[in-house]
Amino acid sequence: MDMKHTLLEALGIEIVENTAERCVAVMPVDHRTVQPFGYLHGGASVALAETAASAGAQNLIDHTTQACVGLEINANHLKSVKEGTVKAIAEPVHIGRTTIVYHIHIYDEQERLICISRCTLAVIKK
């Protein structure tokens, strides 16, 4: 899949592990992902969470007839980050015929939990 000219490229998001059981994505905390006070922007964390869930869901669908799209996402931001890299670990908690739900935990470089998210994806026909 070509990531050129996408939000992933703009934010520096990389998928580092992607299986049916979990997807791990990383993102730098830099000028692209911080808010004006220098802290990681909550929206960037949500983009990372949805990216990890959406990428993971690709392992669970039939690509010839189905696609996954975001239906709902929420996030609780628990700790702030000013530098380094953050890592999202997305694991499916419900794999249904029309929806897939992921829990996503985002950690800083010291493995401190900084964000908890839940993302519901709709499984649609192509």
UniProtKB/Swiss-Prot annotation:
InterPro entries: HotDog_dom_sf (IPR029069), PAAI_dom (IPR003736), Thioestr_dom (IPR006683)
Molecular function via GO: 1,4-dihydroxy-2-naphthoyl-CoA thioesterase activity
Gene Ontology CC: one annotated term: cytosol
Transmembrane stretches, start-end: none
Keyword Hydrolase: yes
Keyword entries, A-Z: Hydrolase
Catalytic activity, EC: 3.1.2.-
Hydrolase as UniProt keyword: yes
Gene3D superfamilies cross-referenced by the UniProt entry: Hotdog Thioesterase
Enzyme class: hydrolase
Signal sequence segment: none
Family membership: Belongs to the thioesterase PaaI family.
Stated role: Is not required for competence.
Name recorded for this polypeptide: Putative esterase ComA2
Gene designation: yuxO
